[in-house]
Amino acid sequence: MPEAPTATVADEQELRERLRGCSTTRWLADGRVARIEGGLSNRAWRLDANGERWFVRLGHPQAARLGVDRESECAVLRAAAAAGLAPAVHACEPACGLLVTRFIDGRTWTATDAQRPGNLRRAAERLRRLHELPVPAGIHAVDYEHQARRLAATLPEGDATATLLAGQAAVAFARIGDGGRATVLCHNDLHHLNLLDDGDRLWLVDWEYGGRGNPLFDVASFLALHDLGPAATAVFLDAYGRLPAADRSRLEDACWLFDYVQWLWYRSRFPEPVGDEAWFAQRLAQRLLRCNN
C-alpha cells in the first residue's frame, strides 16, 4: 500500500479523536500514522502503535446512501478473516465510523498482474474459497437488480442514456433470473486494487460492498473490472470451478449488468463528474451502449 503525501492536519486530528472516542481503539490514538492513498469514498491510514502495525479506515459519513451496510460489512469481514481471506479484524465500529485491521505488508496488484495466467488462477481460487464459506447470520443480501433501481431513481429525469440502458438492463436481469442458485458470501468489488499480495498469500481487502448474493455477479465483477478476453476468462473459470454450464451462458449478461451498476454508481456519486471520474463514467457508458442486450 503506497503512502500518499502528508495528510491534512484536520484529517489526522479527526482520526485521533475518533480513535479516542471508541473504547476498543482508544489505545491506538497516540500511534504514528501515515495516510494511505486511493479510495473514492473513505480515508485510510497505516498506524504504528506498541510495536504493531494496523490499517485504519474512516468510513464515508453517508455510507448508507451509497448502498453500504456497515454492520453487515463487519460480519462479512470477520468471516473472511477467519478463513484467511482478509486481514484479521481488531475493531469494526460502525457507530464510531472506524475499521481497524492488521496491516498487510504486501503489494497491491496492478491491472497487468490481474491478466497473468498464474494470478488469474490465484484470484479464482480465493474467490472459490470465499463462496464455499457458510453464510453467517446478519449478512445483508446484495441484490443487483434492486441496487440498479435504487441508483437509477437518483438520476435526473429525461436522461436519454439512462432510459435506454434501464430498458436493456430489465431484459438482461430477466434472462439471468435466480436460476435456483444458492446465495453465498460475495465480495462484489474484485478490482485489482483490492488484492494484496504478500508474496505467499493473496488477500482480499475493501469489503464494504460484500454481502450475501449471487455468485455469478461476483465472478462477473472480476471479469468486467479487468476486461478479460476469452482465453483469460477460460483460465479464471477453470480455476474457479464452481460455475455451472447454464451460468456460463449468462456471464455476458452478468458482466454487462455489473458495468451498468458501476455506471449508475458513478452517475449518482458524481452528478457532474470531472477528471478521472468523468473519463471512467463515459468509458463505461460507451462500453454499455456498444453491447446489444
Question: PLM features: what roles do these ranges have?
Answer:
Residues A34-V56, V89, V171-F217:
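Active-site acidic catalytic loop and adjacent metal/ATP-binding pocket
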Residues E3, A7, T154, A160-T163, ...:
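ATP/Mg2+ or Mg2+-diphosphate-binding catalytic cores
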Residues R70, S249, D253-L257:
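Start-of-helix signal in alpha-solenoid helical-repeat scaffolds, especially tetratricopeptide repeats
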Residues V171, R201, T233-S249, L284, ...:
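Short amphipathic alpha-helical segments and their helix-coil junctions
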Residues I36-A141:
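ATP-binding pocket architecture of kinase catalytic cores
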Residues T8-W27, G31, E132-N188, D198, ...:
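An alpha-helical support segment within catalytic cores of ATP-dependent transferases
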Residues L216-A245, L257-E272, Q286:
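Active-site activation/catalytic loop segments of kinase-like enzymes and analogous catalytic loops
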Residues S23, G84, L127, H131-V135, ...:
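A general structural signal marking secondary-structure boundaries and capping sites
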